[in-house]
Amino acid sequence: MKKIVLAYSGGLDTSYCLKKFSEDQYEVHAITIDTGGFSDIEKSNIKKRALLIGAKKYKSIKSKKTYYEKIIRYLIYGNVLRNNNYPLSVSAERIIQAIEIIKYAKENNIKLVAHGSTGAGNDQVRFDMIFQILAPEIKIVTPIRDGNISRKNEIKYLEKKGVKIKWSKAKYSINKGLWGTTIGGDETLTSNKALPEKAFAKVSQTNDCKKITLTFYKGEVFKLNGKKMSPVKIIEKLSSLCSQFGIGRDTHVGDTIIGIKGRVGFEAGGPLVIIKSHHLLEKHTLTKWQQYQKEQLSS
């Protein structure tokens, strides 16, 4: 029986891949790379779902701290917003996820890896590129891209195979991480429609005002309201607070690596507040030429 490592998020796309591989007699190692965004309950449910659908082995790899140390803090240093709008919420974490997937495959001498990306966006390129650079000898399998499978047909297939899971938000492709959440759906395939409230992970709950204070040291946030804590914890707390107000929701339009326009909704209140605060602080402390050089480097 062939073994395959699947980058598994617990969502519809990767659940389809898992069931398809299982039905095709693969020994599936479903691996979740925890770059933040999931509660303990959600992580437990992802594991249960993977084993229920047919994974031979399941593992969740903690990479939240690595994600911050290797990537996020540099995005803060550079006040990085793609098209002055999008904080690279999910795109940035794909590198860490791909590296960990290949690392697991090599450690277990598995010659096949898979991801659930479609053929429309940048994620497919990010995964493929990292996989090919780090392990050109390992074959990449992409069922959804290769078969051009729609989400509607994925649900039909899973139901046909007896997977009785209620995909409450299957209409939307949702990717959650420490640096924000992206949401794709029918609305984002247009140029003028906005995502409805129900598409977001949390419904905004208040219209009240709340004052917060962030403290930075050498470009890194290390205090929230005067209380010292890790940058990761601050991002999590700030994101949770912002979601109550609906702060950080927007739609990004960009040019994909494959040459077409792409549109995606996102919610990244914590990241946006941190970046805007850091940028404002720099306006007060850096000279105009320091700011100019820094902007060139971050671009």
Q: What do the PLM-derived regions correspond to, one by one?
A:
Residues M1-S299:
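Nucleotide-activated chemistry modules centered on ATP-dependent adenylation/adenylyltransferase
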